[in-house]
Each structure stands twice: as structure tokens, then as C-alpha cells.
Amino acid sequence: MVLIRVLANLLILQLSYAQKSSELVIGGDECNINEHPFLVLVYYDDYQCGGTLLNEEWVLTAAHCNGKDMEIYLGVHSKKVPNKDVQRRVPKEKFFCDSSKTYTKWNKDIMLIRLDRPVRKSAHIAPLSLPSSPPSVGSVCRVMGWGTITSPQETYPDVPHCANINLLDYEVCRAAYAGLPATSRTLCAGILEGGKDSCVGDSGGPLICNGQFQGIVSWGGDPCAQPREPGVYTNVFDHLDWIKGIIAGNTDVTCPL
């Protein structure tokens, strides 16, 4: 009963900046209940994020999703009518690229969470593998989350929405957003003509390109889904050594520059 009450009544507030620490998918459709067993729902400080289950003890999300009193729910589809196999966890440890937990819009927006106890695999809970090859521009990607489905007005759905978008050349994002450096550890993804995008409430969730987990929802334009204003995603492949090192117990491993 406590779990049902929490899932049904938690409020979703928007961050005061353009980062998608509460983003939903614009222009998508309801995800199939069986297509996202790795997708986790993260609540903190009255905000929400997404995340990805890597194994029974570890979740990968965005650094800007860090907050107090974090709760992590696995096996969720409908927030109003929870699956019977929903599980709740809290962080045991959090790991960031920088010990000061700093990040920018183009670097280090990534956080590994070790759960307080292992997750039990079930019909709606299963991990997603890390990528075996780097992302390729032009790939069709799947983005998903419980973020708002309208922008700038916010409408939050009961179930996660999914949308297919394209992995774009990084220069498209540089043209859209002043201040992005010539190179970064991010990916640029969206639809050039607009209409589909991750948005407020989707942050931390996965970007899956050609079947591989390549990105973490980070930030984008405001309003969301505008023409030639794609979303910016943390590049998972670029951080593989750091992710694998932390999970293996090597806390001295460093993130790529």
C-alpha cells in the first residue's frame, strides 16, 4: 500500500533551467509494457528522472538528477496502477566523474548509483547491456520516459512514452546552442523538423540506437521538440572504462577528459 501511494501521489515539478531533469517524450506514443524492463523511475526532491538498470546492483543516470532522499523504482509502467513486480530501492553509493560532483552541459553529466540491495529480475525488470561499439551518425534511436508530452505547457503521462529519433552530427547541436565546444562527450539526437524530443522529466533515461545503449538524456531546447534544436545526450560509449571500473570496484578510475 505504501508503494502504491507513493507512485500515485508524488508531485512532478519542473526545474528552473533547461536541463531535462524532469523530461518526457514529445511526439511519441505509449511504450509497450514489455519493451522497457531496464527503465527505472527516479524521484528526488519532488522531481523525477529516468535511469537505466545495468545489472542487479547498478543504475546509470544523469549527474544533474542527483538529489536528497532519492527513491528508485524498477518494473514501473503505469504509475497509477503499479505492476505486481515493482521494486523500490535507495542509493547505497553514488559515483560521479568529478569528486566535486560538477558537470557541464557538454561534459560529465553522468552518475552511477549502487543500490542498497540487489534487484530481483522479473517479467518487467531486466538489465540493459552496455554498448559494444560506438554510436554512428544517422542511426535510428529510441528514447523513452515519463517526461512531459507537451511543451512549454506540461502534461505528464501515467505510462512512459517512446519515440524514434535520429542520431545527428554534433555540429547540428553546436549550431543550435551557443557555447558548445568543438568536441565533447555528448551526442546530438532528434528530428531536424522538430516534433519529437525528450523533455522535462526524461532526464537520465536511455537513448538506444540500433539496439545499443548509447546515450543518457541530458538537456535540450526550451520549449522542447523545436525545429533544428535537438536534444543533447551524454555519450555512454565514451565512458565505458569509467563505468566498468567503478562497477568492478576500482574507485580510482577516471572519466575521459
From Swiss-Prot:
UniProt keyword Signal present: yes
Cysteine pairs bridged by disulfides in the record: 31-162, 49-65, 97-255, 141-209, 173-188, 199-224
InterPro entries referenced in this protein's UniProt entry, alphabetically: Peptidase_S1_PA, Peptidase_S1_PA_chymotrypsin, Peptidase_S1A, Trypsin_dom, TRYPSIN_HIS, TRYPSIN_SER
Tissue: Expressed by the venom gland.
Alphabetical UniProt keywords: Disulfide bond, Fibrinogenolytic toxin, Hemostasis impairing toxin, Hydrolase, Protease, Secreted, Serine protease, Signal, Toxin, Zymogen
GO CC terms in record: extracellular region; secretory granule
Superkingdom classification of source: Eukaryota
Subcellular location: Secreted
Listed Pfam families: Trypsin
Other noteworthy facts: Negative results: does not have activity on gamma-chains of fibrinogen (FGG).
Signal peptide residue numbers: 1-18
GO biological processes: proteolysis
Residues cleaved off as propeptide: 19-24
Active site (UniProt): 64 (charge relay system), 109 (charge relay system), 203 (charge relay system)
GO MF annotation, one: serine-type endopeptidase activity
Primary location recorded for the protein, binned into one broad class: secreted
Subunit description: Monomer.
Name of this protein: Beta-fibrinogenase mucrofibrase-3
EC number: 3.4.21.-
Stored CDD domains: Tryp_SPc (cd00190)
PANTHER family, A to Z: KALLIKREIN-1, KALLIKREIN-RELATED
Domain Peptidase S1: 25-248
